[in-house]
């Protein structure tokens, strides 16, 4: 099934069905529960509909996505044109639904149109999903002159509410809307006689907050601002950040994935309003709503930095406070506490590389000199030294970039990242001797990680310093990226031999000869979208673009892997951090 997606800093609509326009669920981040909460309905939380002369008319949506982020559909049936737009305004704790019904016939028609739905469950989502059974309630309130849904397992947890009218003396708004509620089921609608050639409009704001007052007034605020005003404000924000390419299809892919990364790989919590990072705010991604240094800082962060340096700085402030205690640990909750244990060397290097990227792009070295940032950098350096071989300047890892167990503990790619991080630390910590340490590690890689096959030297994937090694590659941490991280040049013959080996048909996970000849790995044995990114950044842009054009991924949004022959999504739908790296790689290859 295909889905449309949209969202802002606070609210995500990750499952808008293309077939009928139904919103299956709404998600938001919540710091006290360490992840995502989702409101869902059995047949849909929000279901647009239209009726004529007492008969429900079927919907046949034809979709658009304004500025690659504002989804809407039009459905034509008999003598009616029905349209629906889902708008998640920038900076607002809510979203709006605009419905427009037009009579294209030559006779008046008695019509009814609106949205109906039900709140049937609340889900807590961090990798896995758990239903919250306690404390759901629905009641009517004077704050929105409608109903409020709330969850109070003792103290309030959250509330969710619409608002379609405001009868106050100085701000009266009357859309001639009606509503009904039966328990947790509702219907919000207009009934009228629609004249030929005329349109009727219904705007339905929804708000989310800690309690009923916060939710209701969030919706009322949107109603008072008006759909057109918040739409124009959101469009201006999006247009200011869009990247334009000569190829319209590639431009659409770049910007769709850019905004998906911005709003699904980061967000603000409803309860504390803190900015935080995660793999994906979509529950469709199989490890959603948790934090990985690598995913957030090596993949999503570069894309976000290209469009919003201030937001990128706030991201780094979160990383060097909430997440600093567990730098290098496999995965964490959004509050920084450990989720999955296991040391990953690439993740330990990621905060340093991201910070250095920010400083180089903005020139804001003062941020890096702040005490909490310096403390975080010192902790990275200390942890690095604890993973160094006692004699040879190579650094070990426990888990590989896929989070899978290592074969041998010294990974070439990981040690290339160490070189990159050490060079950055030399500047950021004003420790020039670390530049020499980086050079010694680089020399150690060439001395111990370069092997030979058929008379041609190449970089092994991993080694144990006792003569054992393996030939392998992982798209989340590919040997193709050694020049990208400054370890070697693209003219390095050893690197060129390595890339030729892992892209050759004889390498079982190269998928050479298939329609999408990009590298996979044992974690997901199909071509990875991250491999397309790696190819774009390593001198194989022409073939990468050809492969990208052959896959729809997850309805235009990055996924983990695709079928090598059909291009259909195989694993990892709604992969937000990967979406960031895809948009950044396209930008580097085509726009910069």
Positions of PLM-derived features:
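Aromatic-rich carbohydrate-recognition surfaces in CAZymes
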Residues: 287-390, 415, 573-592
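Terminal accessory carbohydrate-recognition/targeting modules of carbohydrate-active enzymes
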Residues: 1-244
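C-terminal capping/lid segments that line or modulate ligand- or cofactor-binding pockets
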Residues: 1-36, 288-291, 341-361, 469-489, ...
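The feature captures the catalytic groove of carbohydrate-active enzymes
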Residues: 201-220, 285-286, 331-332, 337-350, ...
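Long, well-ordered core segments of solenoidal/helical folds
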Residues: 257-269, 307-330, 372-393, 437-456, ...
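Active-site-adjacent structural elements in folded domains
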Residues: 82-84, 278-287, 334-339, 401-412, ...
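Extended ligand-binding clefts on enzyme/binding-domain cores
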Residues: 290-293, 379-381, 389-390, 408-419, ...
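An acidic-aromatic substrate-binding cleft motif
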Residues: 220-280
């Amino acid at each position: 099934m295909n889905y449309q997606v949209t969202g802002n800093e606070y609210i995500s609509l990750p499952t808008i069905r293309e077939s009928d326009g139904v919103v299956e669920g709404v998600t938001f981040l919540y710091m006290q529960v360490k992840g995502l909460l989702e409101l869902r309905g059995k047949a849909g939380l929000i279901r647009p509909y239209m009726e004529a002369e007492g008969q429900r008319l079927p919907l046949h949506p034809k979709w658009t996505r304004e500025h690659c982020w504002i989804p809407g559909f039009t459905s034509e049936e008999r003598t009616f044109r029905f349209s629906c737009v889902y708008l998640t305004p920038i900076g607002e704790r809510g979203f709006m639904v605009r419905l427009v019904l037009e009579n294209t016939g030559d006779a008046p028609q008695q019509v009814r149109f609106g949205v109906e739905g039900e709140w049937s469950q609340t889900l807590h989502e961090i990798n896995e999903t758990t239903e919250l059974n306690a404390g759901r309630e629905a009641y009517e309130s004077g704050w929105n002159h409608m109903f409020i849904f709330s969850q109070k397992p003792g103290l309030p947890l959250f509330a969710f509410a619409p608002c379609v009218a405001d009868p106050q003396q100085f701000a009266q708004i009357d859309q001639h809307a009606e509503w009904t509620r039966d328990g947790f089921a509702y219907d919000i609608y207009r009934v009228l006689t629609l004249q030929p050639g005329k349109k009727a409009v219904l705007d339905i704001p929804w708000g989310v907050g800690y309690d009923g007052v916060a939710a209701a007034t969030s919706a009322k605020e949107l109603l008072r601002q008006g759909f057109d005003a918040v739409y124009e404000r959101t469009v201006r924000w999006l247009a200011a950040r869009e990247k334009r390419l000569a190829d319209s299809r590639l431009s659409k892919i770049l910007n769709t994935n850019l905004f998906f990364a911005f709003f699904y790989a980061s967000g603000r919590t409803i309860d504390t309003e803190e900015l935080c990072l995660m793999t994906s705010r979509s529950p469709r991604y199989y490890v959603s709503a948790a934090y990985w240094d690598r995913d957030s800082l090596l993949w999503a962060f570069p894309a976000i930095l290209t469009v919003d340096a201030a937001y990128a700085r706030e991201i780094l402030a979160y990383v060097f406070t909430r997440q600093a205690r567990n730098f290098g640990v496999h995965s964490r909750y959004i509050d920084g506490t450990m989720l999955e244990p296991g040391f990953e060397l690439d993740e330990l290097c990621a905060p340093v590389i991201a910070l250095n990227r920010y400083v180089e792009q903005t020139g804001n070295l003062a941020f890096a000199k702040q005490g909490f940032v310096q403390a975080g950098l010192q902790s990275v350096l200390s942890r690095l030294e604890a993973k160094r071989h006692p004699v040879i300047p190579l650094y070990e890892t426990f888990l590989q970039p896929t989070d899978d167990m290592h074969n041998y503990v010294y990974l070439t790619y990981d040690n290339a990242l160490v070189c990159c991080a050490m060079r950055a630390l030399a500047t950021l910590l004003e420790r020039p001797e670390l530049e020499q340490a980086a050079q010694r590690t680089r020399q150690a890689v060439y001395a111990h990680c370069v092997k030979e096959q058929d008379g041609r030297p190449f970089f092994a994937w991993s080694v144990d310093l006792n003569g054992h090694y393996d030939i392998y590659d992982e798209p989340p941490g590919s040997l193709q990226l050694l020049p990208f991280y400054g370890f070697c040049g693209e003219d390095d013959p050893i690197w060129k031999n390595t890339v030729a080996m892992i892209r050759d048909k004889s390498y079982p996970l190269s998928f050479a000869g298939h329609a999408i000849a990009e590298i996979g790995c044992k974690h997901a044995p199909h071509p990875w979208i991250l491999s397309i990114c790696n190819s774009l950044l390593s001198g194989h842009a022409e073939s990468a673009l050809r492969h990208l054009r052959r896959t729809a991924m997850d309805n235009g949004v990055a996924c983990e892997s695709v079928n090598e022959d059909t291009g259909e999504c195989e694993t990892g739908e709604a992969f937000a951090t990967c979406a960031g790296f895809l948009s950044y790689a396209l930008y580097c290859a085509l726009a910069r």
